[in-house]
Amino acid sequence: MNKLRKFNSKYMFLILVFIICFLGFFVYLKGDMYKCKILSEDEFATLKTWTVEKDNSKVILPCGFKYTGEPIVLTKKIDKVNAFDDSQYLMVMSRYFDYTVYVDDTKVFDLTTPQNGFSKTMGTQLRLVRIGKDLNGKTIKLEIRPLLGDHIQYSVVPMMIGTRSDIVWHILKTEQSEVITAVLIIIFGFVLLLLAMIIRCSEYEDDESGKMFYLGMISVICGIYLACQFKVSHIIAPNGYLPYYFEFTSLMLISVAVSLFIRTNVEGAIKKLYTSMSCIFVLNVLVQTFLNFVLKIDYKMMLFVTHILIGLFGILTLSTMIILRKKKSIQYMLISIMFPIIGSVIDIVRLYRLSDDKTIHFFSMGLYIFVLMQVTRTIRQYLTKSRSHLKAEVYEHLAFTDGLTELNNRLSFENDIN
């Protein structure tokens, strides 16, 4: 039995890391398991026509191709047998692209026009363009321009024409697993916040309610961040800028919630250090929000600041866990936090290997495991403390109350002692 415990404490973490790395390597090798076509440079040079089909398999452009700056032109001639009305939309994606839509050389949409007073790169991952009903026999032309140079593989989704509900339903089916995960994480977070407030208002308030509250914050903020990554969020939002704003704001606030949670597990100077880090993260949110709304500076232009702060926070977190590695709560946190960290690494590999639009799949699953592990431990600790309080009440009741008459005999008890 002792050997088994020693094995669990010494090798379980390495086994978990090995399993996750194996899954990531498997995804890397299976780069062709997704339904897509990777073009050669010769095929790309002759690529000019897209067909509007129900099967919207994407096309991956060659990695390292030297883009000349001229737009990639995709055209589709509408068959005369097709009937269109005013409710028809054209779905176009702009992931790493700028684009312009024409109908018979008449411009109907152009991202060079500022949206809501902000720059053209804000909240433009996906757009539904109303194209009207007079399309029979006409040609839809989509000009796209790469924005990030030749250091990644660009993926292009064929144009999709249909009603708004048809397009939303089609996208929702392709993202259903990620949407379900994000919704569960958000609901889980609100449940934790509610439980934390109930415990805080109870007779036996302790640190476990604070841990549960910060876990709820982490779940809600991360769930919002995941939800803002979905294409369907950019369609159903009343303003396309809202998912963009919440995506960057929640990304900055994740570190605040995690810092406050770790703060409840440490003491002394390290606790003060995490308090200072939380204040710095909050200041970063306020400054970037001011620069974005007042000076109209794009969040993407300030993203490197957030990345630097997250990197410093990651170094601080790992250093804390190494210093306090003998503490059981820190060991447990080290194991649980590796799931979202390694999951995010796998998603980055998928982005550059597959140019996959689902760049948060493994991160979201790792985050879900992290929240479940931490919540399980927090609830178990709270129940243990509650049981101790209950035992103390029972013993006090037996010591100062007559078992037969239920009359308080504290005075006689003290007199006997005296």
Q: Where in the sequence are the language-model features?
A:
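Conserved nucleotide-binding and Mg2+-coordinating catalytic segments in signaling enzymes
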Residues: 393-415
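Interfacial "cap-and-anchor" motif at the non-cytosolic start of specific transmembrane alpha-helices
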Residues: 2-5, 221-391
